[in-house]
Swiss-Prot record:
Residue numbers bearing the FMN phosphoryl threonine modification: 174
GO process terms (BP): electron transport chain
Protein name, per record: Ion-translocating oxidoreductase complex subunit G
Transmembrane annotation, as ranges: 9-29
EC number annotated for this UniProt entry: 7.-.-.-
Compartments where found: Cell inner membrane
Any GO molecular function: electron transfer activity
Organism expressing this protein natively: Escherichia coli O157:H7
Amino acid sequence: MLKTIRKHGITLALFAAGSTGLTAAINQMTKTTIAEQASLQQKALFDQVLPAERYNNALAQSCYLVTAPELGKGEHRVYIAKQDDKPVAAVLEATAPDGYSGAIQLLVGADFNGTVLGTRVTEHHETPGLGDKIELRLSDWITHFAGKKISGADDAHWAVKKDGGNFDQFTGATITPRAVVNAVKRAGLYAQTLPEQLSQLPACGE
């Protein structure tokens, strides 16, 4: 009887150990898969705001943290694109704080000479059917920033048409596009200051 109990006890212990090991392995595989998927999604988003042929470094690994009013409150990530180890452009996280329904989060690609290379909205709470046209799936409006140059802080072209600029507003919704245009302009101007700052910026994860 005692031998039987011991035998069952050992069997249960081995089963428990095996189950624990299997669970740990599955969890690790799941974490790896999620991380890989997130990395692919991030790369796809980068490619929408910065043409892949413009750089040849691992963009996600060239990440810096900045605290700059031009990008909005708090810390924002900035990714430096390099061609043969020379900084040539950046992808910047930016916040438009003055959307109709709150802050609008953006990703802006820009070179260091004042040209915006692409822009995408990553998060917003704008009104469906009105301000949400800043989303690429609903309108191509957000693509109209690509290739546009900013000629200084006083460049009047960088405004919605209602304010005398070059960018369309939406029917019944001017606040949202105005907020995005202004935020992209600020980010593009800030990008021009990055080369001289790089040696002083903390890397992401430090």
